[in-house]
Amino acid sequence: MGKIWRISGPLVIGEDMKGAQVYEIVEIGTQRLVGEVIGLEEDKAIIQVHEDTLELKVGEAIRGTGAILTAELGPGIVGSIYDGLQKSLTVLMEQGSFIERGARVFPLPRDKKWPFTPKVKVGDRVSQGDIIGTVPETHLLEHRIMVPVGMKGIIKKIAEGNYTIEEPVAQIEVDGKVKEITMLQKWPVRKPRPYKQRFAPSKLLVTGMRILDYMFPLALGGKAAIPGGFGTGKTVALQQLARWAQTQLNIYVGCGERGNEMADVLYSFRQLKEPTTGRLLQEKEVFIANTSNMPVVAREASVFVGITLAEYFRDMGYDVLLVADSTSRWAEAMREIGGRLEEIPGEEGFPAYLGSRLSSFYERAGRVECLGSPGREGSVTVAGAVSPPGADFSEPVTQNTLRIVDAFYALDTSLANKRHFPAINWLTSYSLYVD
């Protein structure tokens, strides 16, 4: 498609890029590093690279893929550990202790067979969102196979059996043509998944933290922020939410935080048991680890991959909790990219579009009526940590987040210094979900 014209850290500008589209995935250099087109000007393209650009040279080739950043959806997600681009870290670990640049692995296992049980029969008319079968993904969660968005027709073939995610489990006649349905679906991470209607948040989400459930309740499908200075317990508070919240699935996104904290999360969740069934808590968790030493650009991808996975399970009729630690690190990545693009900075150097980017993430939370039959409701609840420097809540990330969320759990440095945990200041915090 083109070649490298300029390199500035994680930012690459390519020339001779006519035909490229915004948010298209490209492969850069001899190692075929993954990049994403974020801007176009005449025949030049601005590309943010999701991997380390060390040893890249001006003049190396840039190859277009014609595809945009998508998440793979299907059996095998629950219990997995991904990086910000949904590469399976479990598979990458088998290749060595360090992640090689340009490494390519599938997010979902291609050779594993899953027992598929049909819920419809030949001759039934189905449309987008209809549940056509189920797969027992873990002991705690049943994976419901749905008709892909935009497809409807009559079932021509469906059978019980063991299938891989790429083998067709059903055939549908659409306008005289037969199309196959597999258990594997793909969805653009920046595009919200559709639903029938959205409900006002009215049902309580039991978080398992008494101060929240009693004084500052969080609703199913709600949005919450947990801001606090260094050492006030943001990560521990989010971990407690992910452990004990009464939801069917929890997604933990470690976005730009310390690697040892993520290692502690992974270790502890493999030991803890779900209180109602006694099964391991890992059987209802998904982990996305994008630590502070990983490429900064992938921080944005990690939160959008996480919310896309959450919406997918919401469409099955499940209540999903997504915790993001921390959205401030994502905002810092936006500030770094904005600086390298020589954009006019906003307050404290953050880009002027900081608020709209945060909104595009938080506003995908909600309790909805799902597409298809049988009729069902699902929800995505989002809780994000904010790390204001010096515990200054007047800084831009906290203030922009405050405009979006309906529950605000302010962590107090003085309480944390007294070893009062969770260090939630009951005078500053509030919840708009209280009647």
Where are each of the predicted segments found?
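N-terminal accessory targeting/assembly segments
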Residues: 1-93, 97-100
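Short, structured beta-strand/loop micro-motifs enriched in basic residues and often containing a Trp
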Residues: 5-12, 40-48, 106-117, 148-154, ...
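Hydrophobic beta-strand signal
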Residues: 27, 62-64, 127, 133, ...
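Short, compositionally biased
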Residues: 39-44, 75-86, 141-162, 180-194
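Metallocofactor- and cofactor-centric catalytic cores in central/energy metabolism, strongly enriched
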Residues: 42-45, 67, 151-155, 227, ...
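P-loop NTPase nucleotide-binding/switch module
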Residues: 94-148, 164-222, 237-240, 275-294, ...
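P-loop NTPase catalytic core
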Residues: 214-215, 221-435
